[in-house]
């Protein structure tokens, strides 16, 4: 047995990348790893930055998958949407795990750099707002934090001009022969829709005969799966913030924990949750 160090080149691995695309080139790691610029000497500021930057990367993928799922549902090509929505659920499972890393930072450690954040706050996240709007939580007041970036406002307005993910699911429900009341005549998508007894009755019919309406049933369960993970993400956000800053005002001027708790009251797909009581 040779004691020489293992050399991957002996098995054909390329070791010289001059003039060729390497792993770092493909992922543009020089730019990615140069994007962390702490404003203080505090040890934990790098953790804070990376936590939020990686969350934004995962949200970028979530938006990609949600939009693709919506397009598939709109074309009655429902099966691929199942995979996409399952992936979004896994993304939020990953994001939930990230809170555990941030929670290793104590209140004392956070105070060492909090003043460097200025008025920046997570509720100003363009991608998070995009996800909320795509899912149907369309609070138009939340356009205002992006008004200083007209191009971002235009992208959010473009999302508001089209049906949400749940709207696309309801349109599919109607195309499959179910009566969905006023939701069937909607043409203005900008606001948050109201809960509907007709929609609840339609989904209840699906759940009472899942074999007959398997695609609709599976789609509904994928939506519930996703909202379940999304709720956990919101809850973990609340508890992490309370653990680190208590009930202080948020850096963006919100009421901090109290603001985040209000978000826990929002239900994205209300009929899919309420129908369970009557089955």
Swiss-Prot record:
Its cofactor is heme. The gene is kynA. This is Tryptophan 2,3-dioxygenase. Belongs to the tryptophan 2,3-dioxygenase family. Pathway: Amino-acid degradation; L-tryptophan degradation via kynurenine pathway; L-kynurenine from L-tryptophan: step 1/2. It is an enzyme of class 1 (oxidoreductase). It comes from Bradyrhizobium sp. (strain BTAi1 / ATCC BAA-1182). The lineage of its organism: Bacteria, Pseudomonadati, Pseudomonadota, Alphaproteobacteria, Hyphomicrobiales. Coiled coil: none annotated. It comes from the Bacteria. Its EC number is 1.13.11.11. GO terms for biological process: L-tryptophan catabolic process to acetyl-CoA; L-tryptophan catabolic process to kynurenine. Heme binds at residue 237. It catalyses: L-tryptophan + O2 = N-formyl-L-kynurenine. Keywords: Dioxygenase, Heme, Iron, Metal-binding, Oxidoreductase, Tryptophan catabolism. PANTHER family: TRYPTOPHAN 2,3-DIOXYGENASE (PTHR10138:SF0). Substrate binds at residues 48-52, 110, 114, 251. Gene3D superfamilies: 1.20.58.480. Heme-dependent dioxygenase that catalyzes the oxidative cleavage of the L-tryptophan (L-Trp) pyrrole ring and converts L-tryptophan to N-formyl-L-kynurenine. Catalyzes the oxidative cleavage of the indole moiety. One of its GO terms (molecular function) is metal ion binding. Binds 1 heme group per subunit. Homotetramer.
